[in-house]
């Protein structure tokens, strides 16, 4: 659990990578990295392999989380950004519910098969990344973004809400689930159900 959060603290290094890689390409690369890390977790022979795949997966996830809002804002004009960002959030929430619901229904009728779930989830993620690379053209940035780290005092509320959202995710998605399984022996389907309710 601790290793998984190291890339989260290093997510700001995405700014340095963007000096050499276009932001759109970096986002797609992050998505593919997330998929690869997830897929190869299924083949873990040792605990060290699990640590390695967790870090790979986490780098992909945290870089993607860092980039997706920024990329959306560059793609959209200032007039259409609020509406489209809201639609993207709605779509993301729906997909989250659909995936968790599908996993829960699967667990109700079939025995848990970690190998299949990890390979399938990772494979789908990689396929989406390749599709994005091939199908979505490189777009010109409508808003030129500064490639430097800066803080603005007037954005303090946004920073606070982002921090609290991250803390909430850590508590409910990461550590609470781990604690319920490790200390209280919760079944996998019950953890999925709790995550589904939390996502709703």
Q: Where are these predicted regions, by residue range?
A:
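Short amphipathic helix-loop junctions that connect adjacent transmembrane helices
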Residues: 1, 174-191
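C-terminal membrane-cytosol helix-exit motif in multi-pass small-molecule transporters
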Residues: 103-107, 122-141
């Amino acid at each position: 659990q601790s290793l998984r959060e190291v890339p989260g603290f290093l997510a700001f290094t995405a700014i340095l990578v963007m000096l050499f890689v276009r932001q759109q390409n970096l986002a797609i690369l992050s998505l593919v990295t997330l998929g690869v890390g997830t897929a190869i977790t299924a083949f873990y022979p040792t605990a060290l392999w699990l640590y390695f795949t967790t870090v790979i997966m986490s780098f992909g996830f945290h870089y993607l989380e860092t980039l997706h809002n920024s990329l959306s804002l560059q793609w959209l004009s200032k007039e259409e950004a609020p509406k489209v960002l809201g639609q993207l959030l709605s779509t993301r929430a729906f997909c989250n519910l659909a995936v968790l619901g599908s996993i829960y229904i699967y667990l109700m009728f079939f025995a848990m098969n970690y190998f299949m779930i990890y390979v399938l989830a990772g494979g789908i993620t990689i396929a989406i990344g390749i599709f994005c690379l091939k199908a979505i053209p490189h777009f010109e940035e409508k808003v030129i973004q500064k490639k430097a780290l800066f803080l603005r005092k007037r954005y303090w509320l946004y920073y606070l809400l982002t921090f609290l959202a991250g803390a909430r995710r850590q508590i409910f998605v990461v550590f609470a689930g781990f604690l319920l399984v490790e200390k209280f022996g919760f079944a996998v389907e019950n953890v999925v159900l709790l995550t589904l309710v939390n996502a709703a």
